[in-house]
Amino acid sequence: MSKPIQMEKGVKYRDADKMALIPVKNMPTEQKEVLRKPDWMKIKLPADSQRIQDIKSAMRKNNLHSVCEEASCPNLAECFNHGTATFMILGAICTRRCPFCDVAHGRPLPPEAEEPTKLAKTIADMKLKYVVITSVDRDDLRDGGAKHFADCNREIRAQSPHIRIETLVPDFRGRMDVALEALKDNPPDVFNHNLETAPRLYRKVRPGANYQWSLDLLKKFKEQHPDVPTKSGLMMGLGETKEEIVEVLKDLRAHGVTMLTLGQYLAPSRHHLPVERYVPPAEFDELKEIALELGFTHAACGPFVRSSYHADMQAQGLEVK
């Protein structure tokens, strides 16, 4: 039996080291077991460009992180070329160890006090009109990092008065009321929190999270800020059924959520949860129709859709696939 990993503060643990700490064990996927990607999942990546390098340089210069890089998003090149990025605050080390996610796990360092100011300056320099701010889970902080989100919102608006801000927040486990109080005076323009999957799969996919808690977070924020749209996203291909997804959509609507993203899950490595099924584009189209019938004002559904993929277009109600 191998010895448990002794985590050092500030050290990133990935792949096998990260997965070794999960209560529900996921065996490494053998190459012969990996599902082959269908034709609709094969895309030609845009060539590296000066725009991509400029965004990466701005991130490095100010010690900022993007979830695009940390989570190995397949849309990175397209979004960076488009001049958009999803900034990840509160460091690049998560206190959770979800087996679908490529963000590193470990004991994070204290929040950087100057990060909101540096983030706001970088965004102003990039002349962005719409920005998405997300974070790792910070179960080590009393408010789960909510005040840091609020500070970032305030500083960004101070330097870019006409910008729209979308926050993709963690679940603030055990700290919901404290977190919502911290966000009260500086809320975003769109409040996003992902349910990720059907409740039956939570123990395997989101260990440490609770389906009803996440729904309640979305509902309570909406009750406090009725003019701010709430948004959530799900991954497809983890073993869920279509019927389960439809039930989740109904739950989201019952809790006031009006914006939705549905995308195909892609395994970051053989140590992560394997892809159980590649969902055809036609099925995404069908789920979009169902979502709109249920009352969602906008639903971005497609194999390559991610929570923040063309989030500016999503917020305008434009077609995103």
Curated annotation (Swiss-Prot):
<feature type="binding site">
    <location>
        <position position="68"/>
    </location>
    <ligand>
        <name>[4Fe-4S] cluster 1</name>
    </ligand>
</feature>
<keyword id="KW-0411">Iron-sulfur</keyword>
<comment type="similarity">
    <text>Belongs to the radical SAM superfamily. Lipoyl synthase family.</text>
</comment>
<dbReference type="GO" id="GO:0005737">
    <property type="term" value="C:cytoplasm"/>
</dbReference>
<protein>
    <recommendedName>
        <fullName>Lipoyl synthase</fullName>
        <ecNumber>2.8.1.8</ecNumber>
    </recommendedName>
</protein>
<dbReference type="InterPro" id="IPR031691">
    <property type="entry name" value="LIAS_N"/>
</dbReference>
<comment type="pathway">
    <text>Protein modification; protein lipoylation via endogenous pathway; protein N(6)-(lipoyl)lysine from octanoyl-[acyl-carrier-protein]: step 2/2.</text>
</comment>
<feature type="binding site">
    <location>
        <position position="94"/>
    </location>
    <ligand>
        <name>[4Fe-4S] cluster 2</name>
    </ligand>
</feature>
<keyword id="KW-0808">Transferase</keyword>
<feature type="binding site">
    <location>
        <position position="79"/>
    </location>
    <ligand>
        <name>[4Fe-4S] cluster 1</name>
    </ligand>
</feature>
<dbReference type="InterPro" id="IPR007197">
    <property type="entry name" value="rSAM"/>
</dbReference>
<keyword id="KW-0408">Iron</keyword>
<keyword id="KW-0479">Metal-binding</keyword>
<dbReference type="InterPro" id="IPR006638">
    <property type="entry name" value="Elp3/MiaA/NifB-like_rSAM"/>
</dbReference>
<dbReference type="InterPro" id="IPR013785">
    <property type="entry name" value="Aldolase_TIM"/>
</dbReference>
<dbReference type="GO" id="GO:0046872">
    <property type="term" value="F:metal ion binding"/>
</dbReference>
<keyword id="KW-0949">S-adenosyl-L-methionine</keyword>
<dbReference type="Pfam" id="PF16881">
    <property type="entry name" value="LIAS_N"/>
</dbReference>
<feature type="binding site">
    <location>
        <position position="98"/>
    </location>
    <ligand>
        <name>[4Fe-4S] cluster 2</name>
    </ligand>
</feature>
<feature type="binding site">
    <location>
        <position position="101"/>
    </location>
    <ligand>
        <name>[4Fe-4S] cluster 2</name>
    </ligand>
</feature>
<dbReference type="GO" id="GO:0016992">
    <property type="term" value="F:lipoate synthase activity"/>
</dbReference>
<feature type="binding site">
    <location>
        <position position="308"/>
    </location>
    <ligand>
        <name>[4Fe-4S] cluster 1</name>
    </ligand>
</feature>
<dbReference type="GO" id="GO:0051539">
    <property type="term" value="F:4 iron, 4 sulfur cluster binding"/>
</dbReference>
<keyword id="KW-0004">4Fe-4S</keyword>
<dbReference type="Pfam" id="PF04055">
    <property type="entry name" value="Radical_SAM"/>
</dbReference>
<feature type="binding site">
    <location>
        <position position="73"/>
    </location>
    <ligand>
        <name>[4Fe-4S] cluster 1</name>
    </ligand>
</feature>
<feature type="domain" description="Radical SAM core">
    <location>
        <begin position="80"/>
        <end position="297"/>
    </location>
</feature>
<keyword id="KW-0963">Cytoplasm</keyword>
<dbReference type="InterPro" id="IPR003698">
    <property type="entry name" value="Lipoyl_synth"/>
</dbReference>
